[in-house]
Amino acid sequence: MLFRSGKSCIAKLYATFSWLEKALVRGDFSVAYLTKYNRFAKTFCSYQSIQSYFKDDTFLHYVGSAFEFVYENKRFQVKPCIGAVYERPQISYIPAERNLLSVIEDAENIKRLPQPLASMLGVYTSACRNMKSDLELPINQVRFHYDSLNKRSYIQSSDYKVKLNEASSGMQSLSPMFVVLDYLFKVVTKAVPVQQSDKSLKEKEMIQKRIAEILKDDSLDPEARRLLLEQTADSSNKYLLSIVEEPEENLFPTSQREILNSLLAYTSVGNNKLLLTTHSPYILNYLALAIKAWNVSKKVDDEELRKRLYAIVPAGAQINGEDVSVYQIDGRGVIMALPSYDGMPSDDNYLNNMLAECNDLFNDLLDVEERCEE
């Protein structure tokens, strides 16, 4: 989890590195192609619109499972990771602008959408068209309904039904995010079939081409060649990597809790991973609640106590603090890991401190008021 100014840029870099690693393993392009002409900054980072943030002294270092990337002095270097096992992820980037997909009808016909949003739109459209029944949303006991005949989305409950573009701003932010993540979760876990397409045939051709390149590369030792061949040949996505900007967007605190619980439930299955960015102290504190619930669950052996525990944090949303990292960014852009206690993030953090500062300022106002009455 990341919070404070600059967090989105870091999330976008992480998404870019993760996709590049996957693309190299899959054989979309060669290392030589990637490292020439400053393509990393000018081409691949422009996808996330962060190319203008680069400076002459920009230094980036990413260590993945299959490759290690270093950007320094405007040069991009790629090194294979020997001995590591690479599992191919289904990468889903959920941008903060996602509510546009709810507000604008026929969004697929709009030109010049930001590329991450356009990619999300493609998955969102596929999810809607493959929807066999209404999707239960995690807040307010409502469902997402897609009318395939008229190509319109609705929010409905037991006593009302409204078009998504007329629903609350919270619903407009929540719905596309939840529809996309639920669909991709089911694709990865094989709950819904993956549609075969011309793209999948092209992908097979790229894999065969990549295998041929590996076999011809005399610079690789036998072990490196074996690992790269295994990674390239396994073309299925093994887990869901969800990168979500501001899941709390336009939502009341109690709804933020339900959203976080749902996101954590997706993460609790298999090797799924989740990266969140947030401005919300509620998200951070509800995360601490989920970690504490996991700790308490190891001590509970009474059925009534277990029911009380699950009423606070559902079993699927409880998470081991050892699997969680929280980072805050200071005013200079320095990234700092938040200290933890029993796996829970420290409450001495920027978001909570801002709440405390607000209380202090209010107390100062009361003091001024009292002095006026003296």
Write out the residue ranges for each language-model feature.
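P-loop NTPase switch/coupling surface
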Residues: M1-K151, L229-E230, V269-N271, L284-N285, ...
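Switch/communication elements of ASCE P-loop NTPase nucleotide-binding domains
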Residues: M1-K22, D159-R371
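Short, well-ordered strand-loop elements centered on a beta-strand within folded domains, enriched
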Residues: K74-I82, Y154, R332-D342
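Short, solvent-exposed coil/turn segments
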Residues: E87, S148, S157-Y160, N237
